[in-house]
Amino acid sequence: VSRDSKSAGGAFEVLIVDDDPGDVLLIEEALAERRLHHRLHTAGDGVLALEFLRDSAQPRPDLILLDLNMPRMNGRELLGEVKADPALRAIPVVVLSTSAVTEDVTDSYGLRANAYVTKPVDFDDFVATVQHIDDFYLGVVRLPRSPGSHTA
């Protein structure tokens, strides 16, 4: 989905899956600075995210920003569920984690993450990183609608 194809249809739906309220707030602020029409949804763990994704009353996200280390169902488990589900697998999933461990990167790509980005520690770098992700996935890339999409 590119901005062109969404401009007539409305908001870009972004699901942020992260158990750290501070990181969620930073992501929200970074996207708010864009002054574009985003609708942000949050889930504090993989269980809540999967409930959101499988709820036909909820909009289908155009992008999922996913932390790895969370309670109940971690990011790896959620990523595996999303990419195994024909109705969800076309949604781009960007792992946004504090971990720079090679095994985490390799495992995430093995589970079919679309990208793996290490969260910068510096505030300005964090904001810029989120905005680069937004530019690429919601401004440049054209994606097919997921089978069984909740929206037209």
What is the meaning of each model-derived region?
Residues 28, 42-63:
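Acidic, metal-coordinating helix/loop segments flanking the phosphotransfer/catalytic sites
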Residues 114:
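Short, glycine/charged-rich "phosphate-handling" switch motifs in NTP-dependent
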Residues 11-32, 64:
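Conserved acidic segment of CheY-like receiver
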Residues 70:
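Receiver (REC) domain active-site loop signature in two-component systems and cognate sites
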